[in-house]
Amino acid sequence: MKKLISLFTALFLLMSALPAQAESPEISDLLTEYYKEYQELPFGLTEDELTCVDGVLYGRDLLLLYPKTRTDACFVIPDGIGYVWDFAFVGNDSLEKVVVPDSCKILGAYAFWECSNLAEVEFGANSELLIVDDFCFSECHALQQIRLPDSVYLIGEAAFSYMPLHQFVFPEKIVFIGDQLFWGTPVTELTFHAWSLPQYIGSEYFSIDDDDAEYRITLPFDADADRYLGNAEYVMQKENVTVLFCEDTDMPEDE
């Protein structure tokens, strides 16, 4: 009898660890929440391709929805996830730390919008992240620092707006910097890598409007200051602004 009970217990534990399938009530509830933001699933996904693991909705290599009601302080996005979908974590007040796997290439628009207690975002040393989309971390009021992987080439509009960042280092391979990137964010120290060559630098991507703040801006070697500062002559004559240029170094070879 004890062996039979042990067998049933093991079977129950195994079944509870398996992902819920598309017809499950758990997935139905998550889809109801998902469809509040969207009319359809992305990239031709069907409901039969959806899974639910520990209350989080996935489809193929996408993380589609992390419910607002989930109360974990830390969440490790599973290995193999390549895209955190738009609005995936929006409005979760419990989350304090997120670990992004090396496999993740895109953090979608509004993905962490209004995660008011999110204070840490961890990336791996071999991160393949390419895109941080529009408003991705907007209104994350506890996120005082973040260092993006150097693989990131696009940061979307207002991705770091209305949050308490004071320092930011642009990724080495940055190509696109969205408009109003730091709108409403008190960034006072910006750093570009010596040989960063962004092709697009958004309008009003940061401001130097606080006369009581001390600003420090480090530009790429031999940069056209007007491209990075707008009216460079005006900015550089302000007493509370220090503009530096990276030291001349050898151009890194393409990998």
What are these regions (language model features)?
Residues 65, 85-88, 108-111, 133-136, ...:
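Consensus positions within tandem repeat domains that build extended binding/scaffold surfaces
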